[in-house]
Amino acid sequence: AFSCCLFTWTAKSGWHCKNIEIPNESGILCVLGSGSKEFNPNYERYCTSANSGASRNVFHCFIDTLFNTTDPACGGPPQLVGIYRKPGTNAANFGIIYNKKRYLLGMELPDGVTYDTIEWRNELFEIADGSTKKKAHSAASQPDPFRRK
């Protein structure tokens, strides 16, 4: 079982821990940062889609917000961490294929590295091949009907 705690700190009151409830279906734990002003209303729009309750819905909204943001503090390659709700699993970092380049935790990975130990996703949250940078042959399509760009 997972638990989540948001730690904050201020000079006046020091550290504070707020327990975050983990949803029963795929969803958001918390939205932080200046980009939340654009993400939150966009997520309300995405929650009306047939994909509501699926992790790809959250990712589609994140990518759509990132690609269309007016906030100069937001941008760059997306970073993705996932939590599987299956017994005996851990959280995982995902590689992202973004603008035909490979990224892991926001850092571009060079050519010539072994990519098969990383689980890859493309901008549509489709399972991708880290070597070819294309959707994996066996991957299901994950169209984003609300994508603005």
Language-model features: locations:
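N-terminal nucleophile
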Residues: 1-149
